[in-house]
Regions:
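S-adenosyl-L-methionine-dependent methyltransferase catalytic core, i.e., the SAM/SAH-binding region
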Residues: 1-330
Length: 330
């Protein structure tokens, strides 16, 4: 873990163990952060190298020196995780990886916002720290949280909040935000959200702005759209025996990951559950873990931010159509 980007990696032991059986080759850490997971993988598995990517320039700047001790086994790039396919192909072409070893032996997505992003007030992620409404993972590009809350209409804001768990008071909150525009700071917006919710309800369930800020952050960074594309590309890049591990922290992320993995592991089978498949589906993947894993009680005690984590993992068990098991075109 980088001291310049101090983020405790969640479920690192589980990640390392789950990647132990994969074939020698390249693992993508698609959410590099402080490089805690990447360093653990490289230390435990000499047969693996890591391409670490992150869109946050502060994470990249901190992770590169942290991984320098691993030499050519570690490569760091600043990019979004939905750019993974192009990055992998360029890296393997540049380094002369043989055709039968191209693709990914593994991939890791540790989703959501990191501790340094939450704890640095100026980033605007936290409802507890007053700061400009920003929330961009990459602070050099794209729309800000201020753009979202000041430009989205009532129906769009309401739908955004509902999709991210704030179902009961989503429209009341959207109306309150619109009525008190413009918004420029997290502290002021947090108070608007708090005041929109009945006092009796505010006494339970944590801070009323938590889910609203999460929803705004997801919209600012287009997290679900990018995750959807990234998972499709990553699953397609997996070699036979390769695994993709995803750690999610809220229901929207987890639903998307679960749906992708279930579809891949059934080969798109449309037959009724419990009956033999007659639709001709031919799965190329299997679920390594049925359902999801949660962090241990000890880990939650050490790191309260790990409490919401859900880990899912899938493995490629067959070569893609038109390729042999060693990756060559048939």
């Amino acid at each position: 873990m980088s001291q310049a980007f101090p983020h405790q990696p969640v479920m690192a032991t589980e990640v390392v163990d789950l990647l132990a059986p994969v074939p020698p080759g390249l693992v993508v850490d698609a959410t590099l952060g402080g490089a805690g997971h990447a360093a653990a993988i490289l230390t435990a598995h000499p047969h693996l190298s890591v391409l670490g990517i992150d869109r946050d320039p502060s994470a990249v700047a901190a992770a590169a020196p942290e991984l320098a001790r691993f030499g050519e086994r570690a490569v760091v790039r600043r990019a979004r995780f939905d750019e993974v396919a192009g990055l992998v192909r360029r890296l393997q072409a540049e380094t002369g990886v043989p055709v039968d070893q191209q693709g990914l032996s593994g991939a890791l997505f540790d989703l959501g916002v990191s501790s340094p992003q939450l704890d640095v007030a100026g980033r605007g992620f936290s409802y507890r720290l007053d700061a400009p409404l920003d929330m961009r993972m990459d602070p050099t590009s794209g729309r800000t949280a201020a753009d979202v809350v000041n430009e989205f209409d009532e129906d769009t804001l309401t739908a955004l909040f509902v999709e991210n768990g704030e179902r009961r008071f989503a429209r009341r909150i959207a109306r309150a935000i619109i009525a008190s525009r413009p918004h420029t700071a997290t502290g002021e917006l947090s108070e608007v959200v708090r005041a929109a919710i009945p006092a009796a309800t505010r006494r339970t369930g944590g801070h009323p702005a938590r889910r609203v800020f999460q929803a705004i952050r997801i919209a600012v960074n287009e997290e679900l759209d990018q995750l959807d594309r990234a998972l499709d590309d990553t699953l397609g890049l997996l070699r036979t025996g390769g695994r993709c591990v995803v750690i999610s922290y809220h229901s929207g992320e987890d639903r998307l990951v679960k749906a992708k993995f279930v579809d891949a592991s059934t080969g798109g089978c449309v037959c009724p559950p419990g009956l033999p498949c007659v639709c001709g589906a031919s799965p190329e993947y299997r679920l390594v873990v049925r359902g999801s894993r949660r962090p241990s009680a000890d880990e939650v005690d050490r790191n309260r931010r790990s409490e919401a984590a859900r880990l899912r993992v899938i493995e490629r068990i067959a070569a893609p159509v038109g390729h042999t098991a060693n990756g060559e075109v048939a």
